[in-house]
Design a protein with these regions (language model features):
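Glycine/Thr-rich phosphate-binding loops of Rossmann-like dinucleotide-binding domains
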Residues: 18, 31-32, 65, 99, ...
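Histidine-rich, glycine-flanked metal-binding segment
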Residues: 1-4, 9-52
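Divalent metal-coordination and catalytic microenvironments
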Residues: 8, 21, 26, 47, ...
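Histidine/acidic-residue-rich, glycine-tolerant segments that coordinate divalent metal ions
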Residues: 96-107, 111-184
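Residues that line or immediately flank small-molecule/substrate-binding pockets and catalytic motifs
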Residues: 12, 93, 153
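Metal-associated gating/positioning segment near the N- to mid-region
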Residues: 45-116
Length: 184
């Protein structure tokens, strides 16, 4: 379906400009003035700002307790994000119980979020159960489109805690494949 948004004040990295926007499906295909009205739907945005969707780069749809127990908010609540103009969330994905990080990411995207989220969902890996296979998973996560991982130096004496040797080994593996590491 083609949608034409006409006469709005478009705000982007170039600043503000009066312009029309043509959307085909989920993709912006043209921004300009006096675009032809060859669309299934025309929206008059005169007197209004047209902004890109927001990105929430720090979402927690799984709450982690220091005992390693995970509590969940479900992705069907993301309609609230959409109502506020946020079109993408980047959720932290801890190890699901009994799963490695790669399987946890697949589960999160293909089971928990699939068909539930009202916005686009991306993930930060959240290593909450370091094992012998964790280092080998880091490049696989990058290949899957997961650009970052969160590690914990806080919460010593809990399952979340990562000692210096594990932390450094994760950081070295991340450097080799271009993954960003975050430390809490």
């Amino acid at each position: 379906m083609k949608v034409l948004i006409k006469n709005g004040t478009v705000v982007n990295t170039l600043g503000e400009q009066k312009a029309d926007i043509l959307v085909d499906g989920e993709k912006i295909v043209a921004i300009g003035t006096e675009l032809p009205e060859e669309a299934d739907r025309v929206i008059d945005a005169a007197g209004k700002f047209v902004l890109p969707g927001g990105v929430d780069n720090h979402a927690h749809f799984a709450g982690l307790n220091t005992d390693g127990v995970t509590t969940f908010a479900e992705y069907d609540t993301t309609y609230i994000n959409a109502l506020g103009g946020t079109t993408t969330i980047v959720d932290f994905c801890p190890n699901e119980p009994g799963m490695n990080l790669v399987d946890s990411v697949n589960y999160r995207l293909n089971v928990r979020a699939k068909g539930q989220a009202a916005v686009d969902v991306a993930l930060h890996a959240n290593c909450t159960d370091f094992t012998d296979e964790t280092i080998g998973e880091i490049p696989k996560l990058v290949e899957m489109g997961v650009p970052s991982m969160k590690l914990f130096m806080a919460y010593k004496g809990t399952p979340l805690y990562m000692d210096d040797a594990k932390l450094i080994s994760c950081m070295k593996a991340a450097k080799e494949c271009g993954m960003t590491m975050m430390v809490h």
